[in-house]
Amino acid sequence: MSTKPHLIGFIGLDSYDLILFLAKYLENLGQSVLIADYSKFGRLSYCIPAPVSLNPKTDLIRYNNMDFLRHDYESFQREEYNYILIDFGWDISQEVIHSCDFLYIITDLQQQNMEHILHMNLPNISVYILLKNFFHINNRNNAKDYFVENHFNFKKCYLFPTSVKDLENMVMLQYYHDIKLHKVTKPLRNLIHTILIDNLDFDEKEVLSIKRFHKTK
């Protein structure tokens, strides 16, 4: 009997490094993963090399034991996958957003981004805020208080650490397409562990054991 896949949506600032590394973790945990890029400028698409014989805008691309597409995932056999990760960018007009099990909103403390999120008409599902932290201080409470005071409904606010090394990794992903877990910085790895264990209910020991394979995976 086929099982409905878990749909996880990502909204807001660039987060294709998180999406790709999370997908790679899921693959290491024995899960079949489909990644869909619904963002306006196809920011995640640049990370996936397409064979000459395939059109990344219309064809399903198989890369690094994961499937990737740039268009409507519903035209494929969804039941084949355990998880479907969707990058929406800032576009929340996509109907599929209402089918997501979780939504992760990626923002920083810039006021225009925070205010934009307040005006989003999001479905009544589990929403998590990932705060991009470009500083050596914990700004999570600032963001949390802002959204609470403005009656924005979310389950939890996590720090999404972003160092110079993380920014370098993002550029390298687009140019060299090297999705290797040993390249993940420790703070980002900790965030991925939190998502897998706390939100997706994977066994903690199993998740932490993946670090043994970082040099080859």
Task: Label every model-predicted segment.
Residues 31-33, 84, 103, 127-128:
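Hydrophobic anchor at the start of a short beta-strand
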Residues 171-217:
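NTP-binding/hydrolysis catalytic cores, primarily Walker-type P-loop NTPases
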Residues 107-114, 162-165:
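Short, acidic/turn-prone active-site loops that include or flank metal/cofactor-
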Residues 2-17, 32-83, 89-94:
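P-loop/Walker-type NTP enzyme "switch/lid" segment
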Residues 115-126:
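Conserved C-terminal guanine-recognition region of P-loop GTPase G domains, centered on the G4
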Residues 139-190:
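Beta-strand-loop-alpha "switch" segments that mediate conformational coupling across diverse proteins
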Residues 23, 27-28, 97:
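Gly/Ala-rich phosphate-binding loop of Rossmann-like dinucleotide-binding domains
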Residues 90-111:
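Inter-motif core of Ras-like GTPase G domains
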